[in-house]
Amino acid sequence: MAKELVLREGSSAPGGLTAPRVTVDEILARLDRGEQIAFVDARREQEWRSSSQKLPGAVRLSPEGNEETLPLIAPDRAVVTYCTCAHEASAAKVAEMLMARGHKDVHPLHGGFNAWREADGPLEPRTTAG
């Protein structure tokens, strides 16, 4: 059974589904302990295309509703969504999409991609497909 992430109060996804944020430090600590976390890149198309990097193993799931990568994410796996927009809006929207499909342990990354990069979190090259 997956451990619960440390939650940030007052954060919810649109539509009333709760999608509490997690910090970069919390996720880095979990990765250091060997925990498996699925990263979902929820950056808008323009930001995604202009970047050459993504978080390790991240799959792209667009906040505009491109859901073809949903089957790649096991419903029982911890998921962290990230974007580059204010208040993690796209990441929260994608988290809501995942939660509506039965994912339980889904959390937007507080500060998103930029906070991850500033903390020197691991990154990998982004391919054309994702």
Regions found by a protein language model. Name each.
Residues 1-50, 124-130:
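Flexible, polar/low-complexity N-terminal or interdomain linker segments that lie immediately upstream
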Residues 21, 39, 58-60, 106-108:
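Conserved beta-strand scaffold positions in the cores of enzyme catalytic domains, especially
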Residues 33-34, 76, 119:
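Structured helix-beta-strand junction loops
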Residues 35, 102-104, 121:
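Short phosphate-binding/catalytic loops that engage adenosine nucleotides
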Residues 52, 120:
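Short, flexible helix/strand-to-coil boundary loops that buttress conserved ligand/catalytic motifs
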Residues 54-56, 102:
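Short, structured coil segments at secondary-structure junctions
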Residues 63-68:
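Alpha-helical scaffolding within the catalytic cores
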Residues 70-116:
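Catalytic cysteine-centered active loop of the rhodanese-like fold, especially the PTP/DSP P-loop
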